[in-house]
């Protein structure tokens, strides 16, 4: 379990899953590929839900449940618990969202639905790359990246809830709010009840959580938002233990499974003039939009608020890592383009943009290590996860 909990191995699992998916999709003949794709996305288990929806809607809701727990912790007692702590990561996160959107819309204005795709940062992948290659960097770089990624996730949650919600059913939303409220009440009672009564409360919480997910799924809002609502309502005392318990399943099963399904596309053989502008918009948004947005907004914020929370070089490293959209960007791409010819090109753009951003970050971290090679040994405060 300790290996699966490791940020290093989490990034490796994700990368291997995406690579295997692309290889699998492109070695099959077209007829077999079409049959596999139809089975995953069109076959309804018991006439209720497709295998794709189980992963993209149900299992990813568990991931966003853990994200919400971490977000709540950071807002209450962590790196975002005060204005002075949150302002620099907040400004950087804003730049890392606004600039990629601007680049995307300037390149692909004919396909405006894809503007959210380059705004995401994959917290698991980016922290994994930092853990593998950034051992010589100060530990505050990881803290800054985590705060930035948490705010980025918050923005992603808002985008998913607003930009990708269709045919809203307010009746189901009311049911979802009631069940989430009951979940929060049960969580509150669980934190204060005697051990002998937990066998009644825990099943009630699970039933409320399942009912909340079904309600959100039926409401027209993306079902992952159910995970966010439940994570926010969970009692903070239980949050850390539950997040720790879920971590190996999220890192070892949920995220790799989604990465495999989302990246399972056939690489189209298109001439340069037939490539969709959405591909260029997503690719440039992730690679250059994140780099420029986070670094430039960060420099302005550091100067304006006269803070020294992170050096310019380390800010560049974080900016490059911010361009690793991967899992969340793949989800955004599905929501924006699934069922259209642009979808496959969007997946390729996310994968290439994330890979190039990771390579750029690795080069910067290697440069930092080279600059520090003459430093005295035994210095503390390094990234070591």
Swiss-Prot record:
Pfam families, per the entry: Na_H_antiport_1
GO biological process, one term: regulation of pH
UniProt subcellular location: Cell membrane
Primary role: Na(+)/H(+) antiporter that extrudes sodium in exchange for external protons.
Reaction(s) catalysed by this chain's protein: Na(+)(in) + 2 H(+)(out) = Na(+)(out) + 2 H(+)(in)
Segments passing through the bilayer: 9-29, 45-65, 87-107, 114-134, 155-175, 198-218, 220-235, 245-265, 282-302, 312-332, 345-365
Record keywords: Antiport, Cell membrane, Ion transport, Membrane, Sodium, Sodium transport, Transmembrane, Transmembrane helix, Transport
UniProt protein name: Na(+)/H(+) antiporter NhaA
Its membrane topology: Multi-pass membrane protein
Family, per entry: Belongs to the NhaA Na(+)/H(+) (TC 2.A.33) antiporter family.
Keyword Aminoacyl-tRNA synthetase: no
UniProt-recorded Gene Ontology molecular function terms: sodium:proton antiporter activity
Gene Ontology cellular component annotations, sorted alphabetically: plasma membrane
Residue ranges of coiled coil: none
């Amino acid at each position: 379990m300790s290996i699966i909990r490791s940020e290093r191995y989490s990034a490796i699992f994700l990368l291997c899953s995406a690579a295997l998916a692309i290889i699998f999709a492109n070695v099959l003949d077209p007829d077999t590929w079409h049959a596999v794709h139809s089975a995953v996305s069109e076959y309804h288990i018991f006439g209720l839900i497709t295998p794709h929806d189980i992963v993209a809607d149900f299992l990813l809701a568990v991931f966003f449940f853990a994200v919400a727990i971490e977000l709540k912790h950071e807002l209450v007692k962590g790196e975002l618990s005060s204005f002075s702590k949150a302002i620099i990561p907040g400004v950087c996160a804003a730049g890392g969202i606004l600039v990629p959107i601007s680049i995307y819309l300037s390149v692909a204005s004919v396909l405006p639905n894809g503007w959210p795709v380059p705004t995401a940062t994959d917290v698991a992948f980016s922290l994994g790359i930092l853990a593998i290659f950034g051992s010589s960097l100060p530990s505050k770089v990881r803290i800054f990246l985590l705060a930035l990624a948490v705010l980025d996730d918050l923005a992603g949650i808002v985008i998913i809830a607003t930009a990708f919600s269709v045919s809203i059913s307010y009746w189901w939303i009311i049911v979802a709010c009631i069940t989430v409220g009951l979940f929060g009440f049960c969580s509150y009672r669980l934190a204060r009840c005697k051990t002998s009564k937990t066998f009644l409360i825990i099943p009630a919480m699970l039933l409320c959580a399942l009912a909340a997910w079904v309600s959100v799924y039926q409401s027209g809002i993306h079902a992952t938002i159910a995970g966010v609502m439940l994570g926010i309502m969970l009692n903070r005392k239980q949050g850390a233990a539950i997040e720790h318990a879920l971590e190996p399943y999220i890192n070892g099963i949920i995220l790799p499974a989604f990465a495999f399904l989302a990246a399972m596309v056939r690489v189209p053989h298109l001439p340069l003039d037939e490539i969709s502008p959405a591909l260029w918009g997503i690719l440039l948004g992730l690679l250059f939009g994140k780099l420029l947005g986070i670094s430039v907004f960060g420099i302005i914020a550091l100067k304006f608020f006269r803070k020294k929370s992170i050096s310019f070089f380390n800010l560049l490293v974080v900016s490059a890592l911010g361009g690793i959209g991967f899992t969340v960007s793949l989800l955004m791409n599905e929501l924006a383009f699934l069922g259209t010819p642009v979808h496959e090109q969007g997946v390729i753009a996310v994968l290439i943009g994330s890979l190039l951003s990771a390579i750029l970050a690795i080069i910067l971290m290697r440069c930092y290590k080279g600059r520090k090679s003459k430093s005295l040994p035994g210095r503390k405060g390094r990234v070591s996860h």
